[in-house]
UniProtKB/Swiss-Prot annotation:
<keyword id="KW-0175">Coiled coil</keyword>
<comment type="similarity">
    <text>Belongs to the TFS-II family. TFA subfamily.</text>
</comment>
<feature type="coiled-coil region">
    <location>
        <begin position="73"/>
        <end position="100"/>
    </location>
</feature>
<keyword id="KW-0539">Nucleus</keyword>
<dbReference type="InterPro" id="IPR021156">
    <property type="entry name" value="TF_A-like/BEX"/>
</dbReference>
<feature type="compositionally biased region" description="Basic and acidic residues">
    <location>
        <begin position="1"/>
        <end position="24"/>
    </location>
</feature>
<keyword id="KW-0804">Transcription</keyword>
<comment type="function">
    <text>May be involved in transcriptional regulation.</text>
</comment>
<protein>
    <recommendedName>
        <fullName>Transcription elongation factor A protein-like 8</fullName>
    </recommendedName>
</protein>
<dbReference type="Pfam" id="PF04538">
    <property type="entry name" value="BEX"/>
</dbReference>
<keyword id="KW-0805">Transcription regulation</keyword>
<feature type="region of interest" description="Disordered">
    <location>
        <begin position="1"/>
        <end position="74"/>
    </location>
</feature>
<dbReference type="GO" id="GO:0005634">
    <property type="term" value="C:nucleus"/>
</dbReference>
<feature type="compositionally biased region" description="Basic and acidic residues">
    <location>
        <begin position="61"/>
        <end position="74"/>
    </location>
</feature>
Length: 117
């Protein structure tokens, strides 16, 4: 007997249960204090964190972040430094381009040119 399309759409047969539907596993008292590694070498505590999703960041997270508000003077100093570095990169790039061009177009070649008779 076949099910109608509506019944097939409502309940997928091979879908894993959601985390809310799963019963919580009882952890023995001795395992809580001393986590033992599983087959892959990952402790059960760390394995549980992966299953439960990502952990929340600590309270001091915002203070430790590298992104911070700068005063306008610091921003101007940083922009000046960036411009100076760009000019230096441009200068070095032009230097290498000229060296490459001179090597390719020089009349004195590092190897003799052989003409076939």
């Amino acid at each position: 007997m076949q099910k109608s399309c509506g019944e097939n759409e409502r309940k997928p047969q091979n879908m894993p249960k959601a985390e809310e539907d799963r019963p919580l596993e009882a952890v023995p008292q001795e395992a809580e204090g001393n986590p033992q590694p599983s087959e892959e070498g990952v402790s059960q505590e760390a394995e549980g964190n992966l299953r439960g999703g990502l952990t929340q960041p600590g309270q001091g997270y915002k203070e430790d972040s590298p992104v911070r508000h700068l005063d306008p003077e610091e921003m101007i100093r940083g922009a000046d430094e960036l411009e100076r570095l760009r000019e230096e990169i441009r200068r070095v790039r032009n230097k290498f381009v000229m060296m490459h061009w001179k090597q390719r177009h020089s009349r004195s070649r590092p190897y003799p040119v052989c003409f076939r008779p």
